[in-house]
């Protein structure tokens, strides 16, 4: 699916890092407001689901087709769409990120971290406050996902905090390429709706194998 470029893009790279105590404010409220305005119009025509595709919003960061990438110790906030997406990549580390998409409005589909068709990923010491999945694992969607057939596997999530959101760790709904070997431990959930959320669709295909999250502390979560 064609989607707008992210604010920061790491494409076809190897052995690179972005680190430091700075803040990337993506000022995504303009996209949030556009979505809610379009949604009202689409709902009147019983086309609510289409607005998710027609209202293309900008991600905060994208790592794509890359290896040995590290993101460390900065704040990412007010992204127009997903916060940080790791796509078709291997051996990446996200350490000490603070993602806050609950500043100045209600951002739709503002996932914190999305790992998509990628392998050997470490997510640690991150804090995510958002309006959708806190940390989400995906592996391609429908026919295109089956065509690409790249799994998300060998994922470790540890020492992370999920605040507002729709799932500390969510698998899916993009599952076509399979999600395998996920380990989560020493995790804290304060306000997210679920600690582990599994979702897919009847015609999507794929599999979900060997997932083991172990939250240490939960509050107002299922």
Language model region names:
Residues 27-31, 59, 80-86, 103-111, ...:
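Short glycine/acidic-rich loop motifs that flank beta-strands on beta-rich extracellular proteins
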Residues 15, 21, 68, 91, ...:
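Detector for repetitive beta-architecture
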Residues 210-217:
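Conserved small/polar residues in nucleotide/adenosyl-binding loops
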Residues 106, 121, 155, 177:
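Glycine-rich phosphate/ribose-binding loops and adjacent secondary-structure elements
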Residues 1-17, 29-43, 50-67, 82-89, ...:
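Extracellular beta-strand-rich solenoid/capping regions of secreted or surface-exposed proteins
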């Amino acid at each position: 699916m064609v989607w707008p470029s992210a604010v920061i893009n790491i494409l076809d790279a190897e052995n690179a890092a972005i680190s430091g105590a700075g803040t990337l404010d993506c000022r995504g409220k303009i996209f949030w407001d556009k979505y809610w305005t379009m949604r009202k119009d689409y709902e009147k025509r019983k086309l609510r689901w289409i607005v998710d595709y027609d209202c293309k919003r900008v991600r905060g960061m994208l790592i794509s087709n890359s290896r040995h990438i590290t993101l460390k110790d900065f704040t990412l906030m007010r992204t127009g769409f997903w916060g940080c997406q790791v796509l078709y990549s291997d051996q990446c580390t996200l350490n000490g990120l603070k993602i806050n998409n609950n500043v100045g409005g209600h951002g739709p589909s503002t996932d914190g971290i999305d790992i998509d068709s990628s392998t050997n990923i470490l997510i640690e010491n991150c804090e995510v406050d958002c309006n959708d999945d806190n940390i989400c694992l995906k592996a391609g969607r429908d026919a295109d996902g089956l065509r690409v057939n790249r799994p998300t596997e060998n994922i470790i999530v540890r020492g992370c905090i999920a605040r507002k959101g729709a799932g500390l760790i969510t698998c899916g709904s993009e599952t076509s390429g399979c999600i395998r070997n996920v380990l989560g431990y020493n995790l804290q959930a304060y306000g997210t709706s679920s600690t582990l959320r599994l979702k897919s669709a009847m015609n999507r295909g794929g599999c979900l194998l060997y997932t083991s999250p172990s939250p240490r502390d939960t509050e107002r979560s299922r």
